[in-house]
Design a protein with these regions (language model features):
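Active-site loop-to-helix "anion-binding N-cap" substructures in soluble metabolic enzymes
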Residues: 1-248, 255, 260-270, 274-329
Length: 329
């Protein structure tokens, strides 16, 4: 029986007995319930360590579409859990904390996008995967940072395109493809805080280091980066490169997987720029991703809640651009 307070707060914080091995209990429940744990690179290391699969948005979407498990626990943010449900509607998809949102998804409301579409007839809409199902339902094709260029390159050269909500990613794709897409003015609150100044300061300390930056970073940051791409692109490069030091401009959670795969290499996270208040916060971490905890995962598996549901009408329209993305990538 779900408590009212759990429903109101969007997660279950039921305590466990002292000394409980949460990792072991989670794996036990996964086996009993035919469940798998999917985790994004930005979650905490303990979660990545117990996950059945760790990846970026594109890899997680592919895994969600192909899994035979009855239950998926999506350890990431809400739109990722929605994407899992859209691709596997017959599965139970659990989200450890319904409050795990996304600043990019929040920046683009379905009603606002519909109004913008109506003002620009004849335009196709490309939506970044960091969007709600309702926004995807208004979209022609979805992209991730790992496949955006590849997908856009396959669209007709004369196509009139709207890209959203990530302005920085859209601006980069415009530059490398020569397109003139209309760009939504949304930004990731983490990647927006990385600056050229901080990167150059680190470069003085580590002159031989390779600078890797996520495509959600601002243009000037990408301009000084040696490697520009998704988290999966960064991981692939670090594993194949002979370089021993890397300056990393993306959410700090990726450092766990980078270090696990490349134990003999050094990864230096770029600190956030000092805010206008003069106080420096840990803005190279996504507070939404960090809402996922072992206790919440255990409880959501135990009670099979919070579970994700998508309105059937929205779902039927929203899954099409995701499937088109998977076909094109």
């Amino acid at each position: 029986m779900l408590k009212t307070e759990w429903k109101e707060q969007g997660f279950i914080d039921e305590p466990v007995a002292a000394g409980t091995d949460l990792k072991a209990e989670i794996r036990r429940l996964c086996k009993e319930k035919d469940a798998i744990i999917l985790a994004h690179y930005y979650t905490i290391g303990d979660i990545q360590d117990i996950a059945d699969f760790v990846g970026d948005s594109l890899a997680l979407a592919r895994k969600a579409a192909e899994t035979d498990a009855k239950i998926m626990v999506m350890c990431g943010v809400h739109f990722m859990a929605e994407t899992c449900k859209l691709l596997s509607p017959e599965k139970t998809v659990l989200c450890p904390d319904l409050n795990a949102g996304c600043s990019l998804a929040d920046s683009c409301k379905a009603a606002d996008l519909k109004k913008f579409k109506d003002e620009h007839p004849g335009y196709q809409v490309i939506s970044y995967v960091n969007t709600t199902a309702a926004v995807k339902a208004l979209t022609d094709v979805v992209v991730t940072s790992g496949n955006a260029k590849k997908v856009v390159d396959q669209l007709p050269k004369d196509a009139k395109l709207i890209f959203g909500p990530d302005y920085n990613l859209g601006n980069y794709i415009n530059e490398v493809t020569g397109r003139q897409m209309l760009l939504w003015n949304g930004r990731c609150h983490v990647h927006e805080r990385f600056s050229v100044t901080k990167i150059l300061e680190l470069k003085k300390q580590y002159p031989e280091a390779v600078v890797m930056a996520h495509l959600e970073c601002k243009g000037p940051v990408l301009a000084v980066a040696d490697v520009k791409g998704s988290t999966a692109d960064m991981l692939k490069y670090a594993k194949q490169s002979d370089a021993k030091q890397y300056i990393v401009a993306t959410e700090a959670g990726i450092l766990h997987e980078l270090q696990r795969n490349c134990p003999d290499k050094e990864f230096i996270p770029v600190p956030p720029e000092i805010s206008e208040s003069g106080l420096e916060c840990s803005c190279n971490e996504c507070q939404y991703m960090k809402m996922n905890t072992l206790l919440k995962i255990y409880n959501c598996l135990k009670h099979e809640w919070p579970s994700i549901e998508v309105d059937p009408k929205i779902a039927s329209d929203a899954v099409k651009p995701i499937e088109k993305m998977l076909e094109l990538s």
